[in-house]
Amino acid sequence: MTGYYSCPARLARQMRQLLFPRRCPCCRRVLGTLPLCEVCTPRLEELRRGPVMRLDVSRHYLGALDGAAAPYRYEGVVRSAILRAKYEGESWTAVELGVEMTARLFGAEVEMHFAEPVPGLVSGAAIGYDCVVPVPATSRRRGYNVPERMAQPLAHALSLPLLPKALCRVRAGRHQAGLSLDERLENAAGAFRAQEPELVEGKRVLLVDDV
C-alpha cells in the first residue's frame, strides 16, 4: 500500500521517525506501531459524537450544505491537540487527527506503512463526494494549513482528489474561538471565494475544517 506522501517526503518522514518517534496527538506519548495511545483512547471515546449532525439549513441559510459531521466534541484532549496543531507548530498532530477523523467518520482501518499511519481505502460507491477541499487558514505564519494536513489522509482513504487551492480567504474575520454557532456563521459569511471555480463547479465537495 502506498501512503499519501510522495516518496521523498515519506523517506524524510522515516528519517525523522528514527530521531523523533510518532507520538500520541493527545498526550505526546510515544506510539510505536499503535494507531492511538492506549491511555487516551478511552478519553477520546468519552468525547465521541454521533456519526452525522444535520444542520437546520432553513435557519442558517446554508442551502448548498447537505450536512456536517464531527467525530469528537471540541473538549478535553481533542481541544488540546487541535490547539497545539494550530498554535504550537505541531503539524504532525494535524495529520494524526486526520487519520483518526477518517477512521471514525468513514470506517477506514488504519494500518502502519513505513512507520506512518495510513487509513485503508474506503469503497467510493458509498461515499458520494467528488473531491476534498480544506478550509484556507486564517494566517500562513505557521507555515502550513491545519485543515489541509487533516484532509490528506481523508482524501487518500476515499480515493478523492485533494484540492487545497480551490478556496481562498478574502477577509480574515474574527477568531472563531469562543463564538456561538450563530456568531461563527456570521463571522464566516463572505470570508471565502472559489479561487479556481472550475475545480468545484457542479461537484459534491467534502469540506474539511479543524473545528
Please name every model-derived segment.
Residues 1-211:
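Glycine-rich phosphate/pyrophosphate-handling loop used in enzymes and phosphotransfer proteins
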